[in-house]
Structure formats: C-alpha cells, structure tokens
Amino acid sequence: MTQDHKLQVEAIRCGTVIDHIPAQVGFKLLSLFKLTETDQRITIGLNLPSNRLGKKDLIKIENTFLTEQQANQLAMYAPNATVNCIENYEVVKKLPINLPKCIDNVLVCPNSNCISHNEPVESSFRVKVTVEDVVLTCKYCEKEFDRNVVILND
C-alpha cells in the first residue's frame, strides 16, 4: 500500500463497518442506536475525506454484527451509508440499506402531548415515502411529521 492510499482508520478483523455516513452524523448514530452499549472496541472516524460526500463519518464495531432491520433503520439518518460485515479483514456481506416500514425505539415523537413521553412505551413510527420527503406517523398519537422534524427533535 502506498503512502497515498494508507487507511486513516485501522482495519478490523471481524465485525461491522458503517461507511459513507454524512459528516456530523456519526455520533448521533452511536447514541440513538445505542452502538456504544458493548464492551467491544469501536473505532470512529469523523470528517474523513470522501469523493462521494466531500466529508464523511465512519464507524467500525468489532465482533458485532447488525441485523438487516438495524441497518435499515440507519437509512433515516444516513440514506447512502453502506453496512459491511467483516470476517478475517475481508468484506463477506454488504447489507442493503432501505427505509423500513416501521422504526421502533429510536426516534422521539415531536408531539409533546403524545403518551410516549409519559408512559413506559417504546417509540414507534410508520414510515411513508412521498414524492417530496419521508413522512413518519407516530403509533400512539397518530400525528404525521416530516422526517426533518423528527430527526431534529432527537
């Protein structure tokens, strides 16, 4: 490997790599998806150079693999991210990222009167893709919100 192509974030032997995360979103993903609730090593790259995005974030989690459902829930924040499963330093599987029909226990309802704020229930939103944007409907108060309203509410 030449000096020009040196990895900026160390490779992992086994685990998950979430790449092409928009810059400034990596920490939010770690928090919202509780990715730090592990004793495994996590490597984070922030504001790394990217041909596609200009700048990007990157998360590597050793000995941990995301389910397809978990990967899909990332699409709300990082629609063009890639989720790679690594074994023996090689990519063995790429999980597709598509917006799921439902997102549970990640987002917070922007409606301050929603029971999800006062009751011990997990948040749940139905996801509907429209021509202009993504609309989320809270399972409990049944109010609809544009994606950005919910994301900024976290």
UniProtKB/Swiss-Prot annotation:
Keyword Zinc: yes
Protein's UniProt keywords contain Metal-binding: yes
Cofactor list: Zn(2+)
Classification via Gene3D superfamilies: Aspartate carbamoyltransferase regulatory subunit, C-terminal domain (2.30.30.20), Aspartate carbamoyltransferase regulatory subunit, N-terminal domain (3.30.70.140)
GO molecular function, one term: metal ion binding
List of residues binding Zn(2+): 109, 114, 138, 141
Cofactor binding: number and manner: Binds 1 zinc ion per subunit.
GO cellular component annotations of the record: aspartate carbamoyltransferase complex
A Pfam family it matches: PyrI
GO terms under biological process: 'de novo' pyrimidine nucleobase biosynthetic process; pyrimidine nucleotide biosynthetic process
Keywords attached to this entry: Metal-binding, Pyrimidine biosynthesis, Zinc
Subunit organization: Contains catalytic and regulatory chains.
Job description of the protein: Involved in allosteric regulation of aspartate carbamoyltransferase.
Family: Belongs to the PyrI family.
Protein name: Aspartate carbamoyltransferase regulatory chain
